UniProtKB/Swiss-Prot annotation:
GO biological process: cell adhesion
Lipidation (N-palmitoyl cysteine): C19
Lipidation (S-diacylglycerol cysteine): C19
Listed Polar residues bias regions: 288-298
Subcellular location: Cell outer membrane
Protein name listed in UniProt: Adhesin MafA 3
Underlying gene: mafA3
Cellular compartments per GO CC: cell outer membrane
Family per record: Belongs to the MafA family.
Length: 320
């Protein structure tokens, strides 16, 4: 009965001992500079911007204000991949046949006894308990084999947080301006605008996962862009577009078997969960929004504010 219980327990330990997914958690970004990362980040940003509903801005002249969360960092996964060689170890030994012959010395003892005219003679043969000669002979060949599994563990993730990358921010700002232009919406300086459009980029970075099981392994890289936008009429301070959220995720995945491969590589993009907290449920205390719209920092994006040089230049031109 105990053996029946022990077998499934050992089997479960064997199956589950090396299974799991390690996720590096960088601060905002993950270091996104090689080609696949660039492709994923650009795809998620394009999808999020392209999905913006701008119908209410048709025929209007808008001023854009874009704020981006710091997004640049670096990270690396070390260790973790396992190879066939000590989670479970067994050995098979094939030894040759060995025969040893011993030669022991023998000696003879004779004893004569006389008593009352009777004489007795006793002869005995003894063997000395120490071989005088030994001979060992082997027959056949010998072999030894072993099989095991070497587990490298789940690995270690290391990351470094840097300041906002101005090129990433400028690229995202240009994507927004391109979509507005293609939609037939004029983007002008704040002095000539009748509508203010505010876009907050909350998530703009990468996620890397590693899945390790005994037979199946996978490396996954994801890029996410999550933004919230709204538009305000400068004349009456009413919201033309209430706060809306767009969130998209692009993924690149490599599938392995015993870390051999990859036998399959896939890429894709899809909508993902929105922001943990958004402003869609905020209502003004009065009948309209505040008299002053959120201001734009006059420092450029190189100082860590997330506005592109073009937006800052337009804002400065509109100042008296």
């Amino acid at each position: 009965m105990q053996a029946r219980l022990l077998i499934p327990i050992l089997f479960s330990v064997f199956i589950l001992s090396a299974c799991g997914t390690l996720t590096g958690i960088p601060s905002h970004g993950g270091g996104k500079r090689f080609a696949v990362e660039q492709e994923l980040v650009a795809a998620s940003a394009r999808a999020a911007v392209k999905d913006m509903d701008l119908q209410a801005l048709h025929g209007r002249k808008v001023a854009l204000y874009i704020a981006t969360m710091g997004d640049q960092g670096s990270g690396s996964l070390t260790g973790g991949r396992y190879s066939i060689d000590a989670l479970i170890r067994g050995e098979y030994i094939n030894s040759p046949a060995v025969r040893t012959d011993y030669t022991y010395p023998r000696y003879e003892t004779t004893a004569e006894t006389t008593s009352g005219g009777l004489t007795g003679l006793t002869t005995s043969l003894s063997t000395l308990n120490a071989p005088a000669l030994s001979r060992t002979q082997s027959d056949g060949s010998g072999s030894k084999s072993s099989l095991g599994l070497n587990i490298g563990g789940m690995g270690d993730y290391r990351n470094e947080t840097l300041t906002t990358n101005p090129r990433d921010t400028a690229f995202l700002s240009h994507l927004v301006q391109t979509v507005f232009f293609l939609r037939g919406i004029d983007v002008v300086s704040p002095a000539n605008a009748d509508t203010d459009v505010f876009i907050n980029i909350d998530v703009f970075g990468t996620i890397r996962n590693r899945t390790e099981m005994h037979l199946y392994n996978a490396e996954t890289l994801k890029a996410q862009t999550k933004l919230e936008y709204f538009a305000v009429d400068r004349t009456n301070k009413k919201l033309l577009i209430k706060p809306k959220t767009n969130a998209f995720e692009a993924a690149y995945k490599e599938n392995y078997a015993l870390w051999m491969g990859p036998y399959k590589v896939s890429k894709g993009i899809k909508p993902t969960e929105g922001l943990m907290v958004d402003f869609s449920d905020i209502r003004p205390y009065g009948n309209h929004t505040g008299n002053s719209a959120p201001s734009v920092e006059t420092d450029n994006s190189h100082e860590g504010y997330g506005y592109s040089d073009e937006v800052v230049r337009q804002h400065r031109q509109g100042q008296p």
